[in-house]
Amino acid sequence: MAGHSKWANIKRQKARVDAKKAQVFARLSRAMIVAARQGLPDPAANFQLRTAIEKAKAAGIPNDNIERAIAKGAGTLSGDGRQFESVRYEGYGPSGIAILIEALTDNRNRTAANLRAAFSKQGGNLGETGCVSWMFRQRGVVQLTGAIAEADLLEALLDLPAESYDLDESGAIVYCSIADLEALSTQLRQLGYPVEDSELRWIPNDYQLVTDGEQARSLLRLLDTLETLEDVCSVTANLELPPELVTALEATL
């Protein structure tokens, strides 16, 4: 993790700002809808749903809203005739940065039009299905916060279903297979590690370094715009920036 700032870490730096935005409730609600749609609507039997509910409660979302989101995902919400579907979109930003977007929508045409407009405004373009997805793979991600002793973490991970990890002064990110996410998160908690988040995440196979300030600014504006669109659940890019450039751009993020 040392040396350059990858998009996953840039997102973490932006989290405090993003958390203040009104879209946070909608984003967390969509996460619950997706989790309930993809698995059982019972959080005790659905790790992703349970995690999404924990995040929603931590953000102060009322229980009624949580129950409504679960019912919507399960298709049992009365009076709501909309049919939602999970859709993946792909495109390129400035400097040829690959961008993968997951959305939950009841109108593909509306979502695609909004995404296309966002890409065009910042010099990117929405691509065809498959144009960049081969550059990413989905993995389980457990995020730890606070000062983590690398030697102790490495020793602990030798006995856990972890594949790799990144570490810096703010915490650690531990990666695993999709199937091992729940077990890894649970076992790290049991060992006393401060687990902040557990989720499935698309991880770039390789990162593309951008050193031009204007290109980087346009990319960050594009990614921020995409993340605030109503139907968007997640945005992933293979972007890597030098830390000094991130520092210079922090005021504009």
UniProtKB/Swiss-Prot annotation:
InterPro entries: Integrase-like_N, TACO1_YebC-like_2nd/3rd_dom, TACO1_YebC_N, Transcrip_reg_TACO1-like, Transcrip_reg_TACO1-like_dom3, YebC-like. It is found in: Cytoplasm. GO terms for biological process: regulation of DNA-templated transcription. Its main location: cytoplasm. One of its GO terms (molecular function) is DNA binding. Keywords: Cytoplasm, DNA-binding, Transcription, Transcription regulation. One of its GO terms (cellular component) is cytosol. The keyword Transcription regulation applies. It comes from the Bacteria. NCBIfam families: PRK00110.1, PRK12378.1, YebC/PmpR family DNA-binding transcriptional regulator. Belongs to the TACO1 family. HAMAP family: Transcrip_reg_TACO1 (MF_00693). This is Probable transcriptional regulatory protein Synpcc7942_1017.
